């Protein structure tokens, strides 16, 4: 829940000097990316910008405090500021920020700019007190923000120092509007106006000018002088002389003498107690100070000029000037040290009563009250966890003694989930084991079941499916029906375990159950995970169209719940890329893989391994070996600098081995084969994939017998487990083995099986990557004219893809080939006496390659009627009557010239 006062622009106070000369400079702020107002405390930065902002509608204001160094908190408030300025225009980003569904601040800002592209009027965002930000991630993100923000947006930053926002670059490019302390300092005229507003008896212009010079135009000093003069403690000029030459860091003594010592004791205590609040309203003041009518007391303090300012138009929220607030907090620690814990406890209770647990935790920590902190966490920690307030929770749990955690195992579980979310799997098990050892009766019942559900998730993440299955089953046996989150976790883990074991039908049912439960209870990341798993299972079963439809449901869920920034989004676009690749939609597959890389742009490069492998697959299917080699260099570098799941390694190895096959690199294949892992089983798609990689390398090396043993066993497992996509891939590799071993009838038999199975899977590219050997076999099958209609159509499609991407279009019918053919002693006399033109040779090559008339016309960029004329002429010259005879004639010519076809 966001504190309204942090998003409210300060109210323009009466009796303030209107800074006309500075407002004139700010009037052109819309021409700059950044308006930067910098000065030490007390120079009137906030007052100036609140004057400038008055009357503007498309403006948002964000007042920072120390707690805003948490990235999630900063993001929530900044997006809320944009929503304030745009009247709710950026709904997607607002949801993403509220639910913490973004990978990083920069990716959230990128989505923000997409939404703001439709906002065309000038827009202003004010960030006050930016000097409080010390988090380098936020600095880097704000540099990204400034580099990429829309032209119609101006960021206004108020800071006591020069922020780390790439200022020099903006200055060089004339995209920076700067106002510093020298410009903020009051002029003689402004000082005279100031005193005339504040003092009942005006002072002479000359004296006003001398006072202004004595304090170098420092607004806070002028305010203190006016306060002293009203309290009749000193003359204005005497106060000015005392303040001359000092700065904000040396004000404490002066403020004690001139402010605190000149108010009654009740007001002094009111100031000191209320200063612990970063923002305050009537209820907070009443609870913290013990005084009734808190609102009236605040308004009285404001009238006395004691550095209190309103934070919103309603007048409900107030805060002290930062300079004065810091001073009061220091004095409170000295003067009210014994009472301070109780004051913080009162503040925490009041914040809790108003529904702000994050602020309550801040005061409970300051009070050192472990019991209060424990109670807040017991009531609100899971809500904070689900909103990704992870840093705050971690700090809070560290502040609790271990005994307190043991007395409340729910907090131990929370700490373990925090570790799990940060991939600290070993620490999770250590923590839970320690807790179980020390907590009586924890080894049974609901809490033990929740521990087991979390342990099961850790085990499957850590690649231990047997342990994950055991723990998930135990959890489901012991969990009551109402413990929905842990039941979702355990059900999901059990479904994933069954997927790993190849029990696809049971796994699919559990993942569908997980999806249903997760949707019912709004646990959207598990709903998305279950859909991704369902798609993978359906793909493995060979139901690619149903897998596609399941992916569509997942994309819809991402859009509805704004999950675009979750790393799981990359998983989804990657399996979409795999499906598109299988169907030879290579451009779309490549685009999906690149979008996956974009989702992971803020993560370690190792996370991009799978998408990079997919890009290499696209290059290989196109026959673009140069590009594949370049990408492989990067992939192999990543492989050597990370620890990966076996599925990831299998996919990476797949593109390496295919590349070696295409380039004939037997040395690389042999070296890899000596060192690669040989899995114990082959009962899921990634283990099947690794064994297929091994068989492909063996075929390349001519080790046909061991490769055949591997592939036959893979096929047996695939058939028994209904891994139909793997069976389709295995048959294609077995076809290559038989073809290269000279077992042409066996090769044809398994190719026919593969073509038939492809009616279910829709595979195209899996055939294409086998290149010319596949093309030769498909040409023969097409010429036999015995294929069923669906298989005939698919064979022609595959042949076209091979011809398109693997550069076999006219390789045998170019000018050099024709010249050698005509000089060959066995060339048919008909061709000598009536030679074909070069264009007719090209057409014959395309006919031989399986092109239709329309495709030949498109390839040669001529009209279809022209192609018909060429075909008629070459038929006459060759003495053939139809297309199949022309193909057979071309094949004879190629054999005569020594080409294996």
Swiss-Prot record:
Keyword Endoplasmic reticulum attributed: no
Family, as annotated: Belongs to the MalT family.
Superkingdom assignment: Bacteria
Annotated binding of ATP, by residue: 39-46
Keywords: Activator, ATP-binding, Carbohydrate metabolism, DNA-binding, Nucleotide-binding, Transcription, Transcription regulation
DNA-binding region, residue intervals: 853-872
Full protein name: HTH-type transcriptional regulator MalT
A family per Pfam: GerE
Xref: CDD domains: LuxR_C_like
HAMAP family per UniProt: HTH_type_MalT
Function description: Positively regulates the transcription of the maltose regulon whose gene products are responsible for uptake and catabolism of malto-oligosaccharides. Specifically binds to the promoter region of its target genes, recognizing a short DNA motif called the MalT box.
MF GO annotations: ATP binding; DNA binding; DNA-binding transcription factor activity
Description of activity control: Activated by ATP and maltotriose, which are both required for DNA binding.
GO biological process: positive regulation of carbohydrate metabolic process; positive regulation of DNA-templated transcription
């Amino acid at each position: 829940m966001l504190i309204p006062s942090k998003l409210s622009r300060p109210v323009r106070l009466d009796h303030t000097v209107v800074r006309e000369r500075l407002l004139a400079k700010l009037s052109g702020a819309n021409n700059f990316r950044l308006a930067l107002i910098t000065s030490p405390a007390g120079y009137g930065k906030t007052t100036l910008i609140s004057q400038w902002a008055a009357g503007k509608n498309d403006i948002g204001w964000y007042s920072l405090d120390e707690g805003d160094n948490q990235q999630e908190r900063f993001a929530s408030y900044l997006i809320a500021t944009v929503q304030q300025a745009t009247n709710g225009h950026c709904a997607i980003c607002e949801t993403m920020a509220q639910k913490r569904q973004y990978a990083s601040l920069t990716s959230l800002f990128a989505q923000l700019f997409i939404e703001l592209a439709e906002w065309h009027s000038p827009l202003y965002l004010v960030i006050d007190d930016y000097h409080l930000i010390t988090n380098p991630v936020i600095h880097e993100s704000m540099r990204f923000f400034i580099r990429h923000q829309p032209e119609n947006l101006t960021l206004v930053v108020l800071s006591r120092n020069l922020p780390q926002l790439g200022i020099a670059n903006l200055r060089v490019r004339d995209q920076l509007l700067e106002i510093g302390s020298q410009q903020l300092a009051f002029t003689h005229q402004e000082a005279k106006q100031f005193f005339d507003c504040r003092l009942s008896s005006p002072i002479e212009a000359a004296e006003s000018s001398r006072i202004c010079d004595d304090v170098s135009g420092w607004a806070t000093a002028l305010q203190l002088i006016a306060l002293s003069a009203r309290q009749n403690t000193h003359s204005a000029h005497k106060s000015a002389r005392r303040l001359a030459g000092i700065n904000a860091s040396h004000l404490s003594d002066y403020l004690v003498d001139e402010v605190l010592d000149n108010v009654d004791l009740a007001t002094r205590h009111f100031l000191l107690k209320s200063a612990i609040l970063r923002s305050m309203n009537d209820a907070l003041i009443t609870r913290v100070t013990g005084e009734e009518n808190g609102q009236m007391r605040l308004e009285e303090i404001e009238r006395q000029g004691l550095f209190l300012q309103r934070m919103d138009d309603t007048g409900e929220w107030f805060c002290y000037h930062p300079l004065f607030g810091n001073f009061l907090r220091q004095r409170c620690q000295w003067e009210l040290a014994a009472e301070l814990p109780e004051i913080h406890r009162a503040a925490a209770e009041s914040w809790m009563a108003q529904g702000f647990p994050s602020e309550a935790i801040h005061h409970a920590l300051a009070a050192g009250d472990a019991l209060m902190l424990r109670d807040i966490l017991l009531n609100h920690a899971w809500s904070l966890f689900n909103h990704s307030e992870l840093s705050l929770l971690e700090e809070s749990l560290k502040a609790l003694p271990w005994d307190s955690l043991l007395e409340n195992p729910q907090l131990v579980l929370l700490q373990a989930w925090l570790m799990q979310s940060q991939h600290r799997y070993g620490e999770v098990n250590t923590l839970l084991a320690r807790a179980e050892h020390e907590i009586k009766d924890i080894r049974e019942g609901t809490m033990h079941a929740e521990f087991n559900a979390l342990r099961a998730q850790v085990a499957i993440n850590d690649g231990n499916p047997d342990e994950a299955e055991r723990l998930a089953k135990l959890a489901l046996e012991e969990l009551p029906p109402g413990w929905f989150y842990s039941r979702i976790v355990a059900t999901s883990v059990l479904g994933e375990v069954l997927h790993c074991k190849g029990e696809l039908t049971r796994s699919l049912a559990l993942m569908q159950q997980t999806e249903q439960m997760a949707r019912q209870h709004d646990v959207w990341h598990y709903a998305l995970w279950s859909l991704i798993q369902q798609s993978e299972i359906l793909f493995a079963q060979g139901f690619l169209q149903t897998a596609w439809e399941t992916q569509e449901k997942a994309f819809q869920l991402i859009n509805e719940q704004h999950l675009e920034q979750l790393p799981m989004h990359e998983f989804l676009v990657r399996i979409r890329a795999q499906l598109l690749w299988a169907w030879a939609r290579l451009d779309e597959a490549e685009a999906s893989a690149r979008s996956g890389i974009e989702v992971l742009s803020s993560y370690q490069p190792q996370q991009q391994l799978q998408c990079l492998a997919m890009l290499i697959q696209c290059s290989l299917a196109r026959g673009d070996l140069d590009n594949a080699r370049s990408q492989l260099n990067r992939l192999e570098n990543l492989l050597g600098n990370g620890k990966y799941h076996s599925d990831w390694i299998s996919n990476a190895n797949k593109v390496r081995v295919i590349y070696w096959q295409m380039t004939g690199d037997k040395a690389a294949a042999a070296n890899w084969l000596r060192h690669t892992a040989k899995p114990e089983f082959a009962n899921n798609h990634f283990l099947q994939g690794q064994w297929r990689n091994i068989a492909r390398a063996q075929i390349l090396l001519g080790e046909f017998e061991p490769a055949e043993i591997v592939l036959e066993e893979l096929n047996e497992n695939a058939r028994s487990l209904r891994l139909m996509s793997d069976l389709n891939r295995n048959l294609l590799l077995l076809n290559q083995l038989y073809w290269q071993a000279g077992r042409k009838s066996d090769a044809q038999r398994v190719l026919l099986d593969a073509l038939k199975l492809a009616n279910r899977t829709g595979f195209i590219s899996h055939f294409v990557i086998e290149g010319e050997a596949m093309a030769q076999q498909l040409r023969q099958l097409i010429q036999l004219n015995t294929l069923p209609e669906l298989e005939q159509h698919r064979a022609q499609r595959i042949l076209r893809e091979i011809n398109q991407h693997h550069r076999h279009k006219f390789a045998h019918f170019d000018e050099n080939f024709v010249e050698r053919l005509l000089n060959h002693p066995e060339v048919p006399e008909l061709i000598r006496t009536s030679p074909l033109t070069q264009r007719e040779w090209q057409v014959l090559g395309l006919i031989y390659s399986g092109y239709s008339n329309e495709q030949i016309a498109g390839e040669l960029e001529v009209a279809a009627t022209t192609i018909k004329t060429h075909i008629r002429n070459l038929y006459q010259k060759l003495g053939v009557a139809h297309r199949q005879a022309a193909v057979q004639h071309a094949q004879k010519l190629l054999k005569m010239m020594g080409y294996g076809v």
